[in-house]
Amino acid sequence: MDNERLRSLTDLLPADCRAAADLLNRGCACISVDHQSLKAALEHGEGAISHADLLATRPHLFADSMVFVSEAHLLRMAKTVAALERVAALPAYRERVLAHAPPVARHSPGAAGVFLGYDFHLGPDGPWLIEINSNAGGALLNACLLRAQRACCEPVARMMPAALPDEAAFVAMFREEWRLAGRDSRLRPLARIAIVDSLPAEQYLAPEFELFRQLFEANGIAAMIADPAELSFDGERLVCRGQTVDLVYNRL
């Protein structure tokens, strides 16, 4: 797609951003991923992930081209999330739902959960909410991907986000989860996290488990990747491979 056509499309955005996004998605097939930058982002840590192995075993994990979303659809998604949050906080709604749930559902962990996500799919009629995911994956993989984005032309460059994901904010979310849990969290800092999934090495997003392990370790938090069968509770503490676990990052 030439720059002149892209300029005409960007001029459409204020008046009809949905039509402009649709035209861009159908007409702009430029490759926007700088694979050298993506390789550097994935392989910078100890126990590095191989960019080549990742592409060989998971060829569709990263898309080479951008997806354009209209401002109107983003606003609609934000309003949907806000409405759901308001309804979920209503005492009458909570009692109605909990009446049909097992007793354990009444336990409040003190926080909504790290990476609680609302999963929207975009269709001809706009965004549709298909899932509320209490442990959505992909944050670190997307952070690596976003850093590797290169605009194919000036109009697209103006559409790209100015702020990049901050891994420090991700770590802060886990520390806040620990603080809200109460008990020992008031007396000592978060010391060890277990990243848990069934047969974790076989999971499609296993590379992200390793990225999170590296991130935690780099920020002074011991971390391990484990199957739930490796965890045990002695009445006082949660243990994995002989080590006390403070917090479970549940990826089940």
Predicted regions and their residues:
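Preference for protein termini
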Residues: 1-252
